[in-house]
Amino acid sequence: MNMALTLFTNTALASLLVLIAFWLPQLNTYSEKVSPYECGFDPMGSARLPFSMKFFLVAITFLLFDLEIALLLPLPWASHTDNLTTMLTMALLLISLLAASLAYEWTEKGLEWTE
């Protein structure tokens, strides 16, 4: 019962915060809010510089692989558990998923920087 109450409370609080975050910015929209700010001076150029979409995709891919590798960090402590077979199976599954996703990115040329 405590677990269900905790999950419900966390879900309700997260949903409430997301709704507030989407609702509040729509209350006051005016031109000064969307203009670039340069310490009170008139802007010398456009502050909306374009960036490479390839850079963005490589950065997102790096973050995903970094998160997956962070999941492997507790493995040395998990090796002291009673059920070593389950731990090794899950670790092998995670490493296989990491290797398969790296192979997929490589074959789809997602890691190539030149366009």
Curated annotation (Swiss-Prot):
Gene (name only): MT-ND3
Stated name of the protein: NADH-ubiquinone oxidoreductase chain 3
Similarity-based family: Belongs to the complex I subunit 3 family.
Complexes and interactors: Core subunit of respiratory chain NADH dehydrogenase (Complex I) which is composed of 45 different subunits. Interacts with TMEM186. Interacts with TMEM242.
Repressor in keyword set: no
EC number: 7.1.1.2
GO MF, one annotated term: NADH dehydrogenase (ubiquinone) activity
Alphabetically ordered keywords of this record: Electron transport, Membrane, Mitochondrion, Mitochondrion inner membrane, NAD, Respiratory chain, Translocase, Transmembrane, Transmembrane helix, Transport, Ubiquinone
Record organism: Halichoerus grypus
Major subcellular site: mitochondrion
The reaction(s) this protein catalyses: a ubiquinone + NADH + 5 H(+)(in) = a ubiquinol + NAD(+) + 4 H(+)(out)
The keyword Membrane belongs to this UniProt entry's keyword annotation: yes
Locations listed in the record: Mitochondrion inner membrane
InterPro entries (UniProt xref): NADH_UbQ/plastoQ_OxRdtase_su3, NDAH_ubi_oxred_su3_sf
Cellular component per GO, a single term: mitochondrial inner membrane
Pfam families given in the database record: Oxidored_q4 (PF00507)
Annotated GO biological process: mitochondrial electron transport, NADH to ubiquinone
Domain of life: Eukaryota
TM region positions: 4-24, 55-75, 84-104
Topology term for the membrane: Multi-pass membrane protein
Described function: Core subunit of the mitochondrial membrane respiratory chain NADH dehydrogenase (Complex I) which catalyzes electron transfer from NADH through the respiratory chain, using ubiquinone as an electron acceptor. Essential for the catalytic activity of complex I.
